[in-house]
Amino acid sequence: MTKKAIISVYNKDGILEFAKELKNLGYEIISTGGTMKYLKENRIDVINISDVTNFPEILDGRVKTLHPNIHAGILAIKDNEEHVKTLNDLNISTIDMVVVNLYPFKETIFRENVAFEDVIENIDIGGPTMLRAAAKNFKYITVIIDPADYGLVLKEIKENGDVSFETRFYLATKVFEYTAYYDSMIFNYFKYIRGDKSFPDYLTVPLETVQKLRYGENPHQQASFYKITLPFIEKSNIANAEQLHGKDLSYNNILDSDSAIELLKEFDEPTCVAIKHNNPCGVASGDNIFEAYKKVYNSDPVSIFGGIVAFNRKVDRQTAEELKKIFLEIVIAPDFDEDALSLLSTKKDLRILKLLTLDKTDVYYDVKSVNGGMLVQEKDRKLLNEDYQVVTERRPTEKEIEDLIFAWKVVKHVKSNAIVIAKDKMTLGIGMGQTNRIWAVEHAISRSRFDLNGAVLASDAFFPFSDSVEAAGKAGITAIIQPGGSIRDKESIDAANKYNIAMIFTGIRHFRH
């Protein structure tokens, strides 16, 4: 019996050669619409699918393949006598191969100012239906969604007379992989257009491979990097960054770069951020990025070694000359002067990343994996309220308020328990990841290379006891910003008054785990 293949593709890469080879191997080709026209124009004999269904394409092509004569031929179990008898009674032929790829939904939703009607018309219905039917019946049918698999299928047919069970299973798996991804894009796009910010009962995220990584967090762990393919998430992310120079990014590089970019988004004035092991080891703002970088370097010249440095302004030659003096894994910026890029590129292993933007628009969920599930929450975008409360006898000066706001922006991005000490919009000491707050305070104080008189302190959560304020006062710190909310707040306020410290309660906590 002559084998039959249905070919209906939007992406026509390689399809002419594949169809010609199938014809040479004795297959009949059934096709639809644009694909049929394309094959015929290139002198490939095909059967119009309407001749199989005995029904015309209708509704501007919305209904072409949705017919029992097609789907019975795809779904029939070929060694089931009842199925075979039914097909014979109804004069329906079995289908041996389905070659389909889908309307460009992803490309459509990424078009600027795309009309919603165009989005709707690019939701493929008949294609996924045929693909899923064929993938379900993979024991008997070969299904191809990816043009990259044409060669594999032809090779097996030529060598073995048919496609192996293992390959059919592999190809069917690819179909369900892609159709799930395709449907996830549709679901998320519809949810966004409706303005629905609720947490759904069933959450799917459309993820596409950016790169296969050499390894994960450690060399014995395999890893890959995926990006969310939705048009409404922030463009300012590590997945969209353009690599201008250097080795491929590692798993840890990507984590640290993400932390650097997210912290940079807090600042409008020229700012430099240094990240090590997913924590800031130095942050500073200045009149220009050269000044900001020098402040960051001077705040902790040890930890910055082998770290990541990121800027929210174009990198100039003067700054590049300073960066070149030390070993860094990555330099990130919105742009680089030509001579700055040339200079940094002399370090062959240095990864140089250019950000598309540093916008703060709608964001997708913040997602963390746990064994057996995922935790999903809103991004922590809470800003400092202007109605923060001064709870001490002394009010902070204007300069202290500027430094307090600076430190508050930084502490939000430090692992809890987190303390940031700052002065002149420059971090002096950062205490991170401690299991109690006084240790975080002591850690931040001990790490400072500078006199802390006149410095300010930010805490990501309230002080459970007054000991942290006592330690800050003894170190010369003159202002504190913290959420407040402890049952012992009065003890901390009394300690602040004792040392003439101005203290602000924000009412906002910024835990980070």
UniProtKB/Swiss-Prot annotation:
Chain coiled-coil ranges: none
Q: Name one GO biological process term.
A: 'de novo' IMP biosynthetic process
Q: Which InterPro entries match?
A: AICAR_Tfase_dup_dom_sf, Cytidine_deaminase-like, MGS-like_dom, MGS-like_dom_sf, PurH-like
The cysteines joined by S-S bonds are none
EC numbers on record: 2.1.2.3, 3.5.4.10
Q: Which GO terms describe its molecular function?
A: IMP cyclohydrolase activity; phosphoribosylaminoimidazolecarboxamide formyltransferase activity
Provide the catalytic activity annotation.
(6R)-10-formyltetrahydrofolate + 5-amino-1-(5-phospho-beta-D-ribosyl)imidazole-4-carboxamide = 5-formamido-1-(5-phospho-D-ribosyl)imidazole-4-carboxamide + (6S)-5,6,7,8-tetrahydrofolate; IMP + H2O = 5-formamido-1-(5-phospho-D-ribosyl)imidazole-4-carboxamide
**What residues does the MGS-like domain cover?**
1-145
User: Where does the UniProt annotation place the signal sequence?
Assistant: none
Transferase as UniProt keyword? yes
Q: Kindly state one GO CC term assigned in the UniProt record.
A: cytosol
Pathway where it operates = Purine metabolism; IMP biosynthesis via de novo pathway; 5-formamido-1-(5-phospho-D-ribosyl)imidazole-4-carboxamide from 5-amino-1-(5-phospho-D-ribosyl)imidazole-4-carboxamide (10-formyl THF route): step 1/1; Purine metabolism; IMP biosynthesis via de novo pathway; IMP from 5-formamido-1-(5-phospho-D-ribosyl)imidazole-4-carboxamide: step 1/1
Q: Which UniProt keywords apply?
A: Hydrolase, Multifunctional enzyme, Purine biosynthesis, Transferase
* Amino-acid biosynthesis is among the record's keywords: no
Supply the Pfam families for this chain. AICARFT_IMPCHas, MGS
Please give the superkingdom of this protein's source.
Bacteria
Which HAMAP family does this one have?
Answer: PurH
What the entry says about domains is: The IMP cyclohydrolase activity resides in the N-terminal region.
Similarity comment: Belongs to the PurH family.
Q: PANTHER family attached here?
A: BIFUNCTIONAL PURINE BIOSYNTHESIS PROTEIN ATIC, BIFUNCTIONAL PURINE BIOSYNTHESIS PROTEIN PURH
NCBIfam families reported in the protein's UniProt record: PRK00881.1 (NF002049), purH (TIGR00355)
Q: What is this protein called?
A: Bifunctional purine biosynthesis protein PurH
What lineage does UniProt assign to this protein's organism?
Answer: Bacteria, Bacillati, Bacillota, Bacillota incertae sedis, Caldicellulosiruptorales
